């Protein structure tokens, strides 16, 4: 669909609503001020300021007077609740206070008029994500500019059989990355030094949520030469890399266990390595840690790509940016392809856009101060969110 299609559709729908007297008693919830499209001001009813109001954005274009609007609005109309999508970017609503030129061009595609019943889920955290088919294509590895009509006839969201590769799951914790990888990998061994974490893994194996496999305690004593595995995955300790700590890098005693993960990968001659850690890894020690990881992978015959994923953009109710590395053994990579993504992926600064602007992902509102969510986060600690890991793997795994 073209940008003009969405613009025309939106204008028609709004015109009809106004013609039906939406400004009057029929409207109870309209947290939407208005927006500028192609230099024209589209007026909206004033919001009910007693409702929770997401962050307002300001956009200026073609000399038009700046006008404010919020990212999502709910409208009660004829005993139904409709939802307007007005997300300037598919990222953190706090990350962009003014729209860039690219975002202005994408705006018409993001303003959707969609009949979504939300009375059942008044809390934004309980609403599901909306994934557009073209976004599904992208997540399955299709190029962004893919237009082959024969391929387009195939349902892009169809699930095709894919053999699960065998994986050694290091620093398993309570299974966050394990659950994320379940659709793609079969865990044949786990390893975590924390007794409580091992107890959780045992419970997960009993209820069938993860694969049944031996659990090892000390990674330094793990002999991977006796384990048949294709992939090594793990979120190695972040305490020496996080901005919340002293950031000693690999000079510390915990994050240096990255090298143990590399030892295990070499012992089992892994085809691929998937690593997870805090985003602070990328600039720790003036990028020194990142360069050390790069050099270690390269010297052992691996090429790599990485993605940065914000948990909230994967559908979680909390903010947590994590970096995911995928390294492939160099001898397994065809010479005529480029490993990994066409472009670097960072869900905060590079939302998922295609060549033609289309609706992509419904961003959930992340609520600070939610007591229930805060309590849950304290209980599970600093673990990787399965939704977050799965999103990264859906981007990375097609390379396998």
What are these regions (language model features)?
Residues 1-161:
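Feature marking protein-protein/ligand interface regions
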Residues 6-17, 22-29, 34-37, 41-50, ...:
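C-terminal substrate-recognition regions of SAM-dependent nucleic acid methyltransferases
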Residues 156, 184, 206-207, 248-252, ...:
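Glycine-rich, phosphate-binding/catalytic loops in enzymes
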Residues 160-165, 228:
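Short helix-loop-beta connector
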Residues 167-220:
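SAM cofactor-binding core of SAM-dependent methyltransferases
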Residues 179-183, 203, 263-266, 295, ...:
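Short, well-ordered alpha-helices that flank and scaffold nucleotide-derived cofactor binding pockets
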Residues 221-231, 239-386:
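Class I S-adenosyl-L-methionine
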Residues 236:
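Glycine-rich, N-terminal phosphate-binding loop of Rossmann-like dinucleotide-binding domains
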């Amino acid at each position: 669909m073209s940008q003009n299609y969405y613009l025309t559709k939106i204008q028609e729908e709004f015109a009809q609503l106004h013609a039906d007297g939406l400004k009057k008693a029929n409207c109870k919830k309209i947290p939407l001020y208005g927006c500028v499209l192609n230099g024209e001001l589209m007026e909206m009813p004033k919001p009910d300021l007693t409702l929770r109001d997401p962050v307002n954005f300001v956009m200026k274009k073609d000399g038009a007077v700046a006008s404010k609007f919020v990212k999502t609005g709910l409208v009660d109309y004829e005993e139904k609740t409709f939802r307007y999508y007005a997300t300037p970017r598919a990222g953190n609503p706090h990350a962009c206070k003014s729209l860039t030129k690219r975002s202005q061009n994408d705006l018409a595609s993001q303003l959707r008029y969609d009949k979504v019943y939300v009375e059942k889920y008044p809390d934004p955290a309980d609403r599901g994500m909306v994934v557009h088919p073209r976004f599904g294509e992208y997540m399955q590895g299709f190029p962004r500019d893919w237009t082959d009509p024969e391929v387009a006839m195939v349902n892009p969201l169809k699930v095709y059989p894919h053999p699960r590769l065998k994986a050694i799951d290091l620093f398993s914790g309570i299974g966050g990355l394990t659950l994320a990888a379940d659709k793609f990998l079969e865990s044949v061994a786990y390893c975590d030094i924390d007794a409580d974490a091992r107890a959780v893994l045992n419970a997960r194996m009993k209820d069938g949520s993860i694969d049944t496999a031996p659990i090892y305690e000390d990674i330094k004593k793990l002999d991977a030469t006796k384990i048949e595995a294709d992939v090594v995955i793990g979120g190695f300790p972040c305490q020496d890399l996080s901005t919340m700590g002293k950031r000693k890098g690999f000079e510390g005693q915990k994050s240096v266990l990255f090298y143990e993960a590399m030892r295990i990968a070499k012992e089992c001659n892994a085809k691929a390595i998937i690593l997870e850690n805090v985003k602070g890894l990328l600039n720790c020690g003036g990028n020194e840690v990142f360069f050390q990881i790069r050099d270690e992978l390269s010297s052992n015959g691996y090429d790599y790509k990485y993605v940065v994923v914000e948990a909230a953009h994967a559908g979680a109710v909390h903010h947590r940016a994590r970096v995911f590395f995928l390294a492939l053994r160099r001898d397994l990579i065809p010479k005529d392809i480029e490993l990994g993504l066409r472009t670097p992926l960072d869900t905060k600064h590079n939302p998922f856009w295609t060549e033609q602007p289309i609706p992509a992902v419904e961003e959930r509102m992340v609520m600070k101060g939610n007591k229930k969510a805060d309590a849950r986060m304290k209980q599970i600690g600093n673990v990787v969110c399965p939704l977050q890991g799965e999103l990264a793997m859906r981007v990375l795994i097609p390379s396998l």
